[in-house]
From Swiss-Prot:
Residues 72-192 form the B12-binding domain. Gene3D superfamilies: Cobalamin-binding domain. InterPro entries: Cobalamin-bd, Cobalamin-bd_sf. It comes from Rhodobacter capsulatus. Pfam families: B12-binding. This is Uncharacterized 20.5 kDa protein in bchF-crtJ intergenic region. GO terms for molecular function: cobalamin binding; metal ion binding.
């Protein structure tokens, strides 16, 4: 891992670019190799695990949550139940933190989990990531639950790998915004 960091530093590649460009591109190439049967399950698992390890190492250099931006926005980032693709959510969380937004990630939350969380923590927005067409209905339920728990006060955005293929279906979930453009979410929701 250190050798890889050294190579990126020698090429003057910023941490942000590693996280927002190179890691996602590597994940896309791994996915394409899997789809075309050039690599097997074990190779995909190991490769994605290494990308997550690299991302984790990069996150130690981005400390918005630990700095404690008292007036900064707080976002709830949700990976829906059954969703297997989590790397994108981790990249989004890192980028939000880099921009000064505090992020709480929850994986596969149930209704009671969200109820407890919303009762004890104030969030400025919720972002739901979806990578599978099978999760559109679950996203709609999450949007409805969040709206109910916050009496419609919290804005919700949906993003992820299927946005380009299922934008219309995702728009019908009731989310305020459906996009993969994080800058647009930050701007529209006034997060920074």
């Amino acid at each position: 891992m250190d050798l890889l960091f050294d190579e990126f530093r020698a090429a003057h590649v910023p941490v942000e670019e590693m996280a927002t460009h190179y890691i996602p591109e590597a994940a896309r190439q791994i996915g394409a190799a899997w789809d075309s049967d050039r690599i097997g399950f074990a190779q995909v698992t190991i490769a994605i695990s290494r990308l997550q390890e690299l991302l984790h190492a990069l996150q130690t250099l981005v400390t918005a949550d630990s700095v404690g931006c008292a007036n900064g926005a707080t976002v709830l980032l949700i990976v829906p139940p059954g969703e297997q693709h989590t790397l994108g959510a981790l990249i989004v969380a890192m980028e939000l933190r880099r921009r000064g937004v505090s992020v709480r990630i929850v994986f596969a939350p149930g209704l009671s989990d969200l109820s407890r969380l919303m009762a004890t923590t104030r969030f400025d927005a919720a972002l739901i990531t979806v990578g599978s067409m099978d999760r559109v209905e679950i996203c709609a339920k999450l949007v409805k639950t969040l709206s109910s728990l916050t009496k419609g006060r919290m804005r919700v955005a949906i993003g992820g790998a299927i946005v380009s293929q299922r934008a219309e279906a995702l728009a019908r979930t009731g989310a305020d915004l459906v996009t993969n453009d994080l800058s647009l979410v930050i701007s529209e929701f006034s997060l920074v």
